[in-house]
Amino acid sequence: MKIEVNNELISRLQNLALVELNDREKERIKRDIKNILDFFDQINKLDLSNVEPLFHPISTGKLRKDEIIKPLSRDEALSNVKRKEDGFIVGPATYGE
């Protein structure tokens, strides 16, 4: 399935993400999304019929150590949120779409 990366898609993503983008940012996002989708198209064209599936993509087992860090307070977490109400993020309505 080929996804058309156009201004309509960028506007939809902008609304879903609750961000405002200027024209320059929209063009950059459009270019970046197109590059990402083109990369996935290249991956989809690879012949992987003789490749054994991996159980886990990191086969070395070298993962970073878990470290306990101080979590953000509610005020810190909501400091950059465009729409909030009673300490919660208000997102776009998705029911009925």
Swiss-Prot record:
Gene Ontology MF terms: asparaginyl-tRNA synthase (glutamine-hydrolyzing) activity; ATP binding; glutaminyl-tRNA synthase (glutamine-hydrolyzing) activity
Entry-linked InterPro entries: Asp/Glu-ADT_sf_sub_c (IPR036113), GatC (IPR003837)
Highest rank taxon of the organism: Archaea
Biological process according to GO: glutaminyl-tRNAGln biosynthesis via transamidation; regulation of translational fidelity; translation
Assigned EC number: 6.3.5.-
Annotated Pfam families: GatC (PF02686)
Keyword Protein biosynthesis tagged: yes
Known catalytic reactions: L-glutamyl-tRNA(Gln) + L-glutamine + ATP + H2O = L-glutaminyl-tRNA(Gln) + L-glutamate + ADP + phosphate + H(+); L-aspartyl-tRNA(Asn) + L-glutamine + ATP + H2O = L-asparaginyl-tRNA(Asn) + L-glutamate + ADP + phosphate + 2 H(+)
Enzyme class: ligase
Family, similarity comment: Belongs to the GatC family.
Quaternary structure note: Heterotrimer of A, B and C subunits.
Name of the molecule in the record: Glutamyl-tRNA(Gln) amidotransferase subunit C
Organism: Sulfurisphaera tokodaii (strain DSM 16993 / JCM 10545 / NBRC 100140 / 7)
Organism lineage: Archaea, Thermoproteota, Thermoprotei, Sulfolobales, Sulfolobaceae
Gene coding for it: gatC
